[in-house]
Design a protein with these regions (language model features):
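Single conserved hydrophobic/aromatic residue that forms the stacking wall/gate
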Residues: 1-8
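Buried hydrophobic core positions in alpha-solenoid tandem helical repeats
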Residues: 23, 51-55, 84-89, 121-125, ...
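Charge-biased C-terminal accessory regions appended to nucleic-acid-, cytoskeletal NTPase
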Residues: 35-42, 54-56, 73, 87-89
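Alpha-helical adaptor scaffolds
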Residues: 169-231, 235
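Generic helix N-cap/helix-start motif at coil->alpha-helix transitions
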Residues: 4, 14-18, 26-36, 46-50, ...
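Eukaryotic acidic, Ser/Thr-rich intrinsically disordered low-complexity regions
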Residues: 245-286
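Residue-level signature of the C-terminal ends
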Residues: 26, 30, 40-44, 75-79, ...
Length: 286
C-alpha cells in the first residue's frame, strides 16, 4: 500500500534517484513483511490463551469490545462445542471484570454465529447487576438467548431499579408478558429521546408479541426515536398490535427510508379508510 502510493506520488525523474529507489524498495519489503505476517495470523487458529492475552491487553483501552471483535470472530468461527465450553469456564474464573466481559462476548445473541452460553446462567444473572457497565452489558447479551422465568424477573427488577440504561429491556424480547406493558410505558414516557438500543428492543418485543396496549409505547418511540431503520419496524409493530393511525401513515409517505414509504403506501391502498379518517387506525391486515 505504501509502495504504490509513494510510487504514484513521486515524479518519474525522482524515481531514477538511487536514494529514492532504495527508500521505495525498503518500504516494499516492509509492506510485504506486514502482509505476510497478517496472512499467517489469519491462517493460524486462535486459542483461548490468545483471547485471554488479547483481552488483558485491551482491558484498559477505550471501546475494547469493538477492538476485540476480529479475534472473537476468528475464534468462534472454528471453535468446537468443547472449546466454547472451555472459554465459558475461563470467563467465569477470570477475576478482572473487563477481561471477563470480553471473554463472554462470543456468547452474545447479537453475534452472527449464535453460540449460546453453554453453562449454568446463574453467574450471568449476577453479572447483570455489576457496576462494571461492560460486564453487565455482556451478561445481558448472553442472557438474551434464553427464555426463562428467572430472566423475566431479572429484567423487571433491573428496569425498576436502573431504568432503560440497564439494557435489561432486551431480556423481554423472549421473556415478555403482557403485564410488562405498564412498566415499559412508564419508562418510555420519561424518555425525551429514545436511544437506538431501546428502539431496537421495543421493535423486537412488539413485532414478536402482539399487545393492544402497546400503541402508546410505539407512538412515543416512533416520535422520539433517532433511527430511521428502527422506525420502519416500529410502524410494523403498530400494525401488528392493532393498527397504525392514518396520521402516522401519511407522515410515513415522506419518510427518509424507502421501505417505510412503501409499507405505508400498501396499507393505505389496501385499507378502506381514506384521508378523512385522520383520527382512526388502519385495520389489521393479513
Amino acid at each position: 500500500i505504501y509502495t504504490l502510493s509513494l510510487h504514484d506520488a513521486l515524479p518519474i525523474s525522482s524515481l531514477r534517484s538511487a536514494a529514492v529507489k532504495a527508500l521505495v524498495d525498503t518500504l516494499k519489503i516492509r509492506s510485504d513483511g506486514v502482509n505476510l505476517f497478517q496472512a499467517e495470523a489469519k491462517r493460524r487458529k486462535i486459542t483461548i490463551d490468545d483471547l485471554l492475552q488479547i483481552a488483558r491487553g485491551l482491558a484498559a483501552e477505550e471501546r475494547p469490545r469493538l477492538k476485540m471483535t476480529g479475534s472473537i470472530y476468528r475464534f468462534a468461527k472454528k471453535a468446537s462445542d468443547s472449546e466454547m465450553r472451555d472459554l465459558a469456564h475461563a470467563a467465569l474464573h477470570e477475576e478482572h471484570e473487563t477481561v471477563r466481559a470480553l471473554l463472554l462476548k462470543p456468547f452474545g445473541l447479537k453475534t452472527t454465529w449464535r453460540r449460546p452460553f453453554p453453562l449454568d446462567i446463574s453467574p450471568l444473572m449476577e453479572y447483570a447487576w455489576s457496576e462494571n457497565t461492560l460486564l453487565a452489558e455482556s451478561a445481558i447479551d448472553c442472557l438474551e438467548a434464553f427464555k426463562d422465568k428467572r430472566i423475566h424477573d431479572l429484567a423487571v427488577q433491573l428496569l425498576e431499579r436502573k431504568g432503560l440504561g440497564s439494557f435489561a429491556l432486551a431480556l423481554l424480547i423472549r421473556n415478555y408478558r403482557k403485564i410488562d406493558d405498564d412498566l415499559i410505558a412508564g419508562l418510555i414516557g420519561k424518555s425525551g429521546v429514545i436511544p437506538h438500543h431501546v428502539q431496537q428492543d421495543i421493535r423486537e418485543i412488539y413485532c414478536r408479541h402482539r399487545s393492544a396496549d402497546a400503541l402508546p409505547i410505539l407512538l412515543h418511540t416512533y416520535r422520539r426515536g433517532e433511527c430511521a431503520f428502527c422506525r420502519h419496524y416500529i410502524v410494523r409493530a403498530m400494525h401488528r398490535c392493532g393498527g397504525v393511525p392514518m396520521k402516522i401513515l401519511k407522515e410515513c409517505l415522506y419518510d427518509c427510508y424507502d421501505e417505510t414509504r412503501d409499507f405505508a403506501k400498501r396499507l393505505i391502498k389496501r385499507s378502506s379508510i381514506h384521508s378523512e379518517g385522520d383520527g382512526m387506525n388502519v385495520r389489521q391486515l393479513s
